[in-house]
């Protein structure tokens, strides 16, 4: 696949994990990638350096999505770099919080929805003027949106909201020629997934996993890049499970 060649892409939360893997996969396919970070500036610059070393083009952009104006500030930076055309938006940035219903605070709940739902919604809104015909938006949901996973009720609700937004975005933006899809990763070995870092968590994951291994960020990043490519031109409004066959 090489369809993103010569195109521009923004990947949020791209300093590590799935975002990093998505940025590198898109750059490998020829896209100029904007690597967004909130706090991991050094890690984001390392991603840019890795892309540049391989002959690609990348820049860093920064915004705090817990702030009400985070999406607006990021969109302003993006437009200053790419001008009037953004071809790919990967809204990956997110946070997690493990807590029982009794333990979940209003502050935790609001922050989860601010970063995981409000930010991607208004980022799409702010970037619509430069997302033209043929552009692709990829959101990141989670397998947790459709299953009771441990103590993740509030987090899972945010990912369920993302799966719903995909349908509405795809319907509303179809006339513009903009495709919108999502990936729903299962258990992936990232910093966000504390569950996979314990023996009990790994054992449980493998027990319900058809391929009997933990997913890696690259497993998801490659699917994100595919959904952004022309090869996926007839996939729209869908959420693709990327879980290696969990709970078949």
Q: What role is predicted for each listed range?
A:
Residues 15-16:
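Conserved glycine-rich cofactor-binding loop
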Residues 100-101, 105-113, 205:
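Substrate-binding pocket helix/loop in short-chain dehydrogenase/reductase
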Residues 102, 134, 147-153, 175-176, ...:
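Active-site loop immediately N-terminal to the catalytic Tyr-X3-Lys motif
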Residues 124, 158, 166:
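Active-site helix of classical SDR
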Residues 129, 171-175, 233:
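Alpha-helical segment proximal to the catalytic Tyr-Lys
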Residues 142:
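Residue(s) in the substrate-gating loop at a strand-loop-helix junction
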Residues 182, 203-235, 244:
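C-terminal helical subdomain
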